[in-house]
Amino acid sequence: MKGEGKVFLKSRMKWIGLLGLVLSAFSLLVHFLLAGFTDDSISDYSIPVTIFSWRPIFDNPRFARHTPLYRRLWGPTRHVETLLPDANPRGFHSDPPARTNGFVFVRIQGGFHEIRNSIPDVVAVSRLLNATLVIPEIQSTTSSKGISSQFKSFAYLYNEEHFMATIANDVRVVKTLPKNLKWARRKKQIPSFKVSYGSSPYYYLHHVLPVLIKHSVVELVVPHGGCLQAILPSDLEEYQRLRCRVAFHGLQFRKEVQELSTKVLQRLRPLGRPFIAYDPGMTREALAYHGCAELFQDVHTELIQHKRAWMIKRGIVKGKLSVDSAEQRLAGLCPLMPEEVGILLRAYGYSWDTIIYVAGGEVFGGQRTLIPLHGMFENVVDRTSLSTSWELAKMYGREAKHNDIKKMTPPSIEVETKHDSLKSTRQRPQPLPPPPARPKYYNIEGWWGWVAESDNEPESTVIELRTNAHKLLWEAIDYVVSVEADVFISGFDRDGKGHPSFASLVMGHRLYQSASAKTFRPDRKQIAMLLEEIRDHMYEANHTWITSVRKLLKRSILEGLMESSKRSKAFSFLSHPVPECSCITRTHPVSNATNLGVTHRCPQWVDGAVSERLKEYKNAEKEEDLDEEDLSSSGLFFGHKESGGNNNGNNETVNSEANNKEEGQLEDQEELEGSER
């Protein structure tokens, strides 16, 4: 009986185990089916960044939008809400004639901001010369071998068809030269002009136009990011609006770039939270031009100094090789470091879980310079953390594979064998000379390694040329994100030639598209002086210093706009396209927009579209701009929210009540000062 009971028990356990396996398999099958059918619907409600390296970390997922603190940090800029974009022709505007004086073929050199600044100038020059414009050739793509043959030159970055349709009523435009002129260009038989930065209309009418009429074609080489002076005479004001139509409406990125930019924007707004776009402006060329090498250490200083020596040799820089970087920084001529920008943002009131998007291409010094910013803000991201490699590959197109990347490997160790004569004799050989020095292959690894071996910078490899073309697409994504950001701040707005840079174009586009969008234009000289006051204790700022920073940053929104009209516009019209490309509403004409020189009234149909928004602004002005839950004491300045649940939050509210009245008076005083200006 006992044996039969054991056998029965074993067989029963086997059946139970088998049943468990069947149920497990059935459960897995059901889960897979449910996942397959519900994948599309669930993706609409889930945070779209779960497959990326960035995991958003928030103190409180619920983000209150109707508080005074939100309006101060993220709300629209007051007093310029009546400023609206208007780049349409005013008065009589003639279409381009059927017969022109000839063809203008343009080759544009430089990076993203130089290309974008040059194209509107080229279109304006073509209309000025009554010429047919050939789609401009972008040197950064034509010289880069190995890029996708699907996109060439202008079409590698922008949408050709949209560009041609936008300017069809202004300039005749064709994709290529006629066959006979194309052959002459290949033989270098057409006249060519290397145009200087900011050339005057007089230059084109008296030097280029006669040659164009004689030869029916001219080639313009634009090497410096702009071929027409920024400020034109009053009788050529329509050419300024033509520039705006080209830059802000005609230059649309190609479909693949636009789609990825939209995806990045969607992934940047988890749970509908706002974000800051930050452009460090720290390029090697800009640092060398302005003499900021001593802000860095070791090899980075050598690289900057080498570039400055190269600029001096070619006449780009007129100063000395060795410059006191500390004096340059105090004079506001060097970029604000990411750590300093982080301190300013925290002092203004942005919390540790604020989303910050780092834009503007590569940051000189690498990710090491961004470590302090990551330490102050948890959600610091860029395009690499918001896109996948296959999405970037799709944007690049199908590219040829190159095997010219030769990895530096240690030299082979040759095993020396004794000669037969030494083996046969018993005589002790003479001491051998010391072996030759081991090649310092470890010193020349990396893109900077040539500094240790040579005074001459090596020529770019095929892969480096292709990467330069990719950088145009990377900055295109950054440009779209920066223009659409809730807040924008830059560490520097000058390039390696002293001209307005990527950040300047972004600020100009934001001013045109939405003048009330919050854009900080900090005075670097005043910021440097404030930072010097706490240089020895930067993370223990007191309430007085924080108040000074807030006043300075708040003034930079409007006063920086006024300063930009004097400083940046003289070099680049697109960095400040006001008042030529703006209008002011008829129902609410009184604002700081009139101080910017805007007197043209918008069409009547525009007033109805903005009336509701203006009511919201007025209601916001009636409330005190208090900093609720604002950690303004030095002890909590850079601290994350401590554990303690609601009790801690209540304590912060109680502690902040004493400061609310004082800060409310400060904000009211600033509003009065702003209205007086």
UniProtKB/Swiss-Prot annotation:
Regions of biased composition (Low complexity) lie at: 644-658
Tell me the compartments it is located in.
Membrane
Q: Keywords of this protein's UniProt record, alphabetized?
A: Carbohydrate metabolism, Fucose metabolism, Glycoprotein, Glycosyltransferase, Membrane, Signal-anchor, Transferase, Transmembrane, Transmembrane helix
- Per the annotation, which location comes first and is thus the protein's main one? membrane
Query: What top-tier enzyme class does this entry carry?
Result: transferase
Task: Give the way it sits in the membrane.
Answer: Single-pass type II membrane protein
Record-linked InterPro entries: GDP-Fuc_O-FucTrfase
| EC number(s) reported in the record | 2.4.1.-
- GO MF terms, alphabetically ordered: glycosyltransferase activity
Glycosylated residues are 130, 542, 592, 651
Q: According to the UniProt record, where is the region Disordered?
A: 410-437, 619-677
GO terms under biological process: fucose metabolic process
Q: Which family does it belong to?
A: Belongs to the glycosyltransferase GT106 family.
Q: What is this protein called?
A: O-fucosyltransferase 27
Organism phylogeny: Eukaryota, Viridiplantae, Streptophyta, Embryophyta, Tracheophyta
Q: Which gene encodes it?
A: OFUT27
